[in-house]
C-alpha cells in the first residue's frame, strides 16, 4: 500500500526551500527590476548608448534566469503533487515511482539555485580575465603555466563559458611565460575569483636528465571585466605604452606590423597586454580596459583586506600566498585553504575543478 506521509514531508520541505530561495535571492525585487529595465530599454535616450543597452540586456538576462528557474520549480512541485495524489488514490506504483524521481530532479534544481547564494559579491556577475604568470622554476614553471592554461580552458568549456586568449608570451623552450584569458558567461568572475593565488607543482621533471624532483610555481590573478565607467583615477603620465610584433596566431600579418600593445602602470608595475586584434588601436583599447578593471579589482581587494598587496603577489611567486599544491608523483592535489584533496590528478588537470572551487565559495573565500 502506498503511504503519503513521507512524500508529504518531502513536498513541504521543497516548498519551504523555494520560499527561502525567493527571500535570499530577492525574487520580488528582481521581478520589479526587470520591469524597470524594460522601461529603460524603451527610452530613446538609452538607445543612443550602446554600452548601456548591452549592460541592461545582460542584467535582464541574469535576473530572468533566476526568476524563470524559480517559477519552473514551483510549477513542477504543483504537478508532482497532482501525480502523487493520483498514485495514492489509484494505488499506482508506477506513477508513484515516477513522482519520486521527479521529486529528486526538483531537489537538484533547488540545490543549483541555492548555490547562487555564493555569488553575493559586488562584481560576481561580470565576465572576467585570468592572468597566468610563470614564476620560479625555469622551463618547468613555463610548462606548468601552460598546463594551468589548459586546465582553466577545459573547466570553462565544461561550465559553458566562452573563452578567448587575449595575450600570450611563449616560453623559451616549452610552455608559456604568461597569458591572459577572457572568460565570458553567467557569473564568470564569481566562479573564478577564488583561484587567485600561487599554484605549486611538484614532479619529476621531464626536462631533467636525472629525473629529479622539481618544484615550480605559477601565479594566477582573476579580475572582473567591468563593462561600464569605472570610478578609478588613472594618471596617464603613470602609464608606459609599448608596441611590439604579435607572437600568436594571425599569419604573416603579425610579423609585418607592430600591432600588439603592452601597457605598464609604473607606480604598481602592473602590466596588461593585448595582441589578438590586427588593429593596434583596438589592442590598445582592450589593454587599457583590462588595466582599468585590474586596478579596480586590486583597489577593492585592498579595501576588503581579503588579499595581500598585489605587488607582493606579483613579485614573489614562490612559497608565499600558495593556495594549492599539485604533487604529481604522489597523485595528490591539495587545496591549502579549504583542505579539499583529490587523487585523480589527470582528471583535475583536464578541468575537473568543481570540488575545489565550490568548497572555496561555500567557505566564503
Curated annotation (Swiss-Prot):
NCBIfam families assigned: prfB
Family: Belongs to the prokaryotic/mitochondrial release factor family.
Subcellular localization: Cytoplasm
Keyword Protein biosynthesis: yes
Function: Peptide chain release factor 2 directs the termination of translation in response to the peptide chain termination codons UGA and UAA.
Protein name per the record: Peptide chain release factor 2
Disulfide links within the chain: none
Pfam family name, one: PCRF
Highest rank taxon of the organism: Bacteria
Further facts: The gene for this protein contains a UGA in-frame termination codon after Leu-25; a naturally occurring frameshift enables complete translation of RF-2. This provides a mechanism for the protein to regulate its own production.
Stored SUPFAM superfamilies: Release factor (SSF75620)
Keywords assigned by UniProt, alphabetized: Cytoplasm, Methylation, Protein biosynthesis
Organism listed in the record: Buchnera aphidicola subsp. Acyrthosiphon pisum (strain APS) (Acyrthosiphon pisum symbiotic bacterium)
Stored InterPro entries: PCRF (IPR005139), Pep_chain_release_fac_I (IPR000352), Pep_chain_release_fac_I_sf (IPR045853), PrfB (IPR004374)
GO biological process, one term: viral translational frameshifting
Keyword Glycoprotein applies: no
One GO location term (cellular component): cytoplasm
Processing after translation: Methylated by PrmC. Methylation increases the termination efficiency of RF2.
PTM sites of type N5-methylglutamine: 252
Annotated GO MF terms: translation release factor activity, codon specific
